[in-house]
Amino acid sequence: MGTALKLTQTLVLRDPDNAGHAARVTELALRLAAAMDVSPSRVKAIKAGGQLHDIGKLELDRAILDKPGALDPDELEEIRTHPELGARMLHGIRSLRAALNCVLHHHERWDGGGYPYGLGGEAIPLEARILAVADAYDAMTSLRPYRGARTREEALAEVERCAGSQFDPRIARVFLSL
């Protein structure tokens, strides 16, 4: 995992707030994977994917990432490129191949309304579906430049509300039981 650590450190240097986010997402996703009795190979992918899921943001304009208000359509489109940018960054690194699907698909939605490919249901790799719940929960409970943090209860209610649309309903149920 030396390469993953170096890439994570690079991201942290550019975006210190992301350090805590990546660590929290990884921890939540690993707890969720353990509760679901996920195989060791998938756990390894989730660990690396959690650390690196936003690595593509290294390629984005810092002003967009730090913008305090709503993003305009062009800025939103640029943000939505980060999964593919991250996957391209990892593509040639053999030791991080397991993380590739997590990085590429963590913004796909159970109902097919996500990005970058609009995958839905079981077409989304399990590791990415697990990370999606952990990532969204941490995003909701963290202070962002454009909004305040939600309470734990508010975020859990949102995960429950989005089960079957944004999130795999089985994974959401397990997450809510943690």
Predicted regions and their residues:
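Metal-dependent catalytic cores of enzymes that make or break cyclic nucleotides
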Residues: 4-178
